[in-house]
Amino acid sequence: MVAKAVCVINGDAKGTVYFEQEDACAPVKVCGEITGLNKGQHGFHVHEFGDNTNGCMSSGPHFNPLNKEHGAPTDENRHLGDLGNIEAPGDGPTKVCINDSKITLFGENSIVGRTVVVHADPDDLGKGGHELSKSTGNAGARIGCGVIGICKI
């Protein structure tokens, strides 16, 4: 059974990101466009809570139900919400196209109802040596966010 979700991102960064998963064992395809980003890499994560009452700050930490350290999307040891970086061209919208086999739209670890956060700085993927590397990737301020919601199939 196919599952689809959507996230409308607001803040200094704005955009729409779509999620699609063919079944519970398939990777999730994440595609969309985001505007308002400076040229370069920006951390892109799923955070624990779908609460944006205090802007992006109330979305909590990265979604991490398995209690792992922060890492790259290809690392075995990573938060489920660690989707790495998106690359902004600086002269137009940033295209997002990620296939991730750790996140899911099904079951108890579903990302539906949680928040996507776009960060001001690059995610160092847990390898930067900064005190925040193993928790946030030292990705800086939260400049855009939105709650992931179920959408019509």
Curated annotation (Swiss-Prot):
One family name in Pfam for this protein: Sod_Cu
Organism: Chymomyza amoena
Keywords (A to Z) from UniProt: Antioxidant, Copper, Cytoplasm, Disulfide bond, Metal-binding, Oxidoreductase, Zinc
Family: Belongs to the Cu-Zn superoxide dismutase family.
Gene3D superfamilies assigned to the protein according to its UniProt record, in alphabetical order: Superoxide dismutase, copper/zinc binding domain (2.60.40.200)
Known partners and oligomeric status: Homodimer.
Primary localization: cytoplasm
EC number: 1.15.1.1
Function: Destroys radicals which are normally produced within the cells and which are toxic to biological systems.
GO-annotated cellular components: cytoplasm
InterPro entries found in the cross-reference section: SOD-like_Cu/Zn_dom_sf, SOD_Cu/Zn_/chaperone, SOD_Cu/Zn_BS, SOD_Cu_Zn_dom
Molecular function terms, GO-annotated: copper ion binding; superoxide dismutase activity
Stored SUPFAM superfamilies: Cu,Zn superoxide dismutase-like
Protein name: Superoxide dismutase [Cu-Zn]
Substrates-to-products reaction catalysed: 2 superoxide + 2 H(+) = H2O2 + O2
UniProt-annotated binding residues for Zn(2+): H62, H70, H79, D82
Annotated S-S bridges: C56-C145
